[in-house]
From Swiss-Prot:
Entry's Gene Ontology BP terms: amino acid metabolic process; biosynthetic process
Positions bound to L-aspartate: 39, 125, 175, 375
Organism, as annotated: Rickettsia prowazekii (strain Madrid E)
UniProt name for this protein: Probable aspartate/prephenate aminotransferase
Gene designation: aatA
Reactions this protein catalyses: L-aspartate + 2-oxoglutarate = oxaloacetate + L-glutamate; L-arogenate + 2-oxoglutarate = prephenate + L-glutamate
Keyword Acyltransferase: no
CDD domains: AAT_like (cd00609)
A GO CC term attached to the entry: cytoplasm
Taxonomic placement: Bacteria, Pseudomonadati, Pseudomonadota, Alphaproteobacteria, Rickettsiales
Site (Important for prephenate aminotransferase activity): 12
């Protein structure tokens, strides 16, 4: 009898973390690799946030807290939702967890039974399907390629709904594409969902504050307040405040759902880190001045990367509304032969080729459910980003 559970048969390690691991190994071996795989901002956590954390340590705020987050942080989250999204939540409709990933894991563990279906637009963030599977749910994939601007149409949504559908996932702006749903698109989705009262919606808003040009962010509960009881909104401090390592995410939904998720959390991690919670309060309540400047910085990087990669004849690029990724269509390169005689047949082959030939680490599109693409993160310095994109261009021209 194997010591490993059969549960592991339905899931796999995070492909993006695997790329990061391989990149670090090559760098350690002295290879000049430029890493465009990691999904985290390249700027440091702001000093005002770090100072509050230091003070909380010195003040001895280092013990257990409420499982679902301290009231002061939940109040800051409540205020944030009202101030920025015009949504009213009570404290018992909010949970704080060890990162947004745990919020989503708790959500599915608390709500899914065997056979319950979760509609996941493709491409998707790598962890969605596996967390659904771990929770005994069934992922239902809906292809939303570049021809659909990487967004779910109401026709595709309606076609995917069955009597087993329990959740629809909306991630806007999206990882891996940066595509964002505008107000009208969300209104159309809400109009469709009103016909299906048993379908709940998880809105993953983690990239809310990283948007470009004239794109205006909306979240579904803001657009459709009549659906609020069926909407669970996920957010956190990781991306907007560059606090990926602090591990604070939060969610808001019905009291019954939050209570169930708190029970799940009480038997896994208990409370989020006490020090990180204090830092998150400062992130939400303190100055927000750097958020806009950081978004403008990412926009410049997006434009730089696009200006170079759009020159590659094999590529088709989508201009993202937010986040810090490009999801580039590259299937025209499939079937070509490298100098060593290897055939590039899929996105894994192409990513391996870029790593070997260009010394640039990217993530193959198949990791996000859609072969024929690759993802780059432009959350790096302008100099390194330009060099990486030029290397990719030259490697493609060499084929």
């Amino acid at each position: 009898m194997s010591i490993i559970s059969t549960r592991l048969n339905s899931i796999k390690p995070s492909p993006t973390l695997a790329v990061v691991k391989k990149t670090l190994e090559l760098k350690k071996a002295g290879v000049n690799i430029i890493a465009l795989g990691a999904g985290e901002p390249d700027f440091d956590t702001p000093d005002n946030i770090k100072e509050v954390a230091i003070t909380s340590i010195k003040d001895g705020f280092t013990k257990y807290t409420n499982v679902d987050g301290i009231p002061l942080l939940k109040q800051a989250i409540k205020n944030k939702f009202k101030r920025e999204n015009n949504i009213d939540y009570e404290l018992d409709e909010i949970i704080v967890s060890t990162g947004g990933k745990q919020v989503i894991y708790n959500l599915f563990m608390a709500s899914l039974d065997k056979g319950d279906e979760v509609i996941i637009p493709v491409p998707y963030w790598v962890s969605y399907p596996d967390m659904v599977a771990l929770s005994t749910g069934t992922p239902v994939f809906v292809n939303c390629g570049i021809e659909n601007n990487f967004k779910l149409s109401v026709e595709a949504l309606e076609h995917s709904i069955t009597d087993k559908t329990k959740w629809l996932i909306i991630n806007s702006p999206s990882n891996p594409t940066g595509a964002g749903y505008n107000c009208k698109e969300l209104e159309n989705i809400a109009k469709t969902l009103r016909k299906y009262p048993n379908v709940n919606i998880m809105s993953d808003d983690i990239y809310e504050h990283i948007t470009f040009d004239d794109f205006k962010f909306y979240t579904l509960a803001q657009i459709a307040p009549d659906l609020k009881e069926r909407i669970f909104t996920v957010n956190g401090v990781s991306k907007a405040y560059s606090m990926t390592g602090w591990r604070i995410g939060y969610g808001a939904g019905s009291k019954a759902l939050i209570k169930a998720m708190t029970i799940i959390q009480s038997q896994s991690t208990s409370n989020p880190c006490s020090i990180s919670q204090m830092a998150a309060i400062e992130a939400l309540n303190g100055t927000q001045d750097y958020i806009k400047s950081n978004a403008l910085n990412f926009q410049k990087k997006r434009d730089l990367a696009l200006s170079i990669l759009e020159e590659v004849t094999y590529f088709e690029c989508y201009k993202p509304e937010g986040a810090f990724y490009l999801f580039v269509k590259c299937d025209k390169i499939f079937g070509t032969k490298t100098k060593s005689g290897r055939i590039i047949a899929n996105s894994n082959n192409f990513s391996e080729y870029l790593l070997e030939e260009a010394k640039v680490a990217v993530v193959p599109g198949i990791a996000f459910g859609l072969d024929g693409y690759f993802r780059i993160s432009y959350a790096t310095s302008m100099q390194e980003l330009e060099e990486a994109c030029i290397r990719i261009k030259h490697a493609c021209n060499a084929l």
